[in-house]
Amino acid sequence: MELCTILTMKLRMEGNNIRLRLKKSDIEQLKKEGIVGETVAFSDNLYFYYKLKTNQHDQEINATFVRNAVQITLPLSIANTWMDTEQVGIQFTLDSGLIILVEKDFPCKTRDDEDKNDTFQELALNNC
């Protein structure tokens, strides 16, 4: 299992869709390390992992599920454009029909108790 720094990336799965939402700190880690991920512990010996990785050799977005781990891999050029601009998200449909959406995390105006220091406030009005 490939190790990665654990931050606060969010995973949402609905139907045949996977959505990852990254905060600013997650994106900084992805730029620095090339990978960011989270672990969900169901018990002492049962874990579920989800990871987002960049790869300079890949030409297409890819998703795998191996050893209890969902891994989304973005070509480095696509990831860099998204990370370094105001582009909100990347959406891609795999041949299997799986829809992948990777997006920047914005605060929701309806959650007054949410810590909004690590979200992209400047674009939030158009994306919640």
Show the residue positions of the predicted features.
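Extended intrinsically disordered, low-complexity coil regions enriched in Ser, Thr, Gly, Ala
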Residues: 23-43, 82-93
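Mid-chain, well-packed structural core segment of small domains
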Residues: 59-94
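Surface loops and adjacent helix of pleckstrin homology
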Residues: 23-25, 32-33, 75-77, 103-105, ...
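Short, positively charged and aromatic/hydrophobic N-terminal segments
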Residues: 2-5
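C-terminal charged interaction modules
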Residues: 87-128
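A short, charged
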Residues: 46-60, 64-65, 102-114
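A low-complexity, Ser/Thr/Gly/Pro-enriched, surface-exposed linker/loop concept
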Residues: 34-56, 120, 125
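Short, structured motif recognition centered on aromatic/hydrophobic residues
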Residues: 11-13, 18-22, 70-74
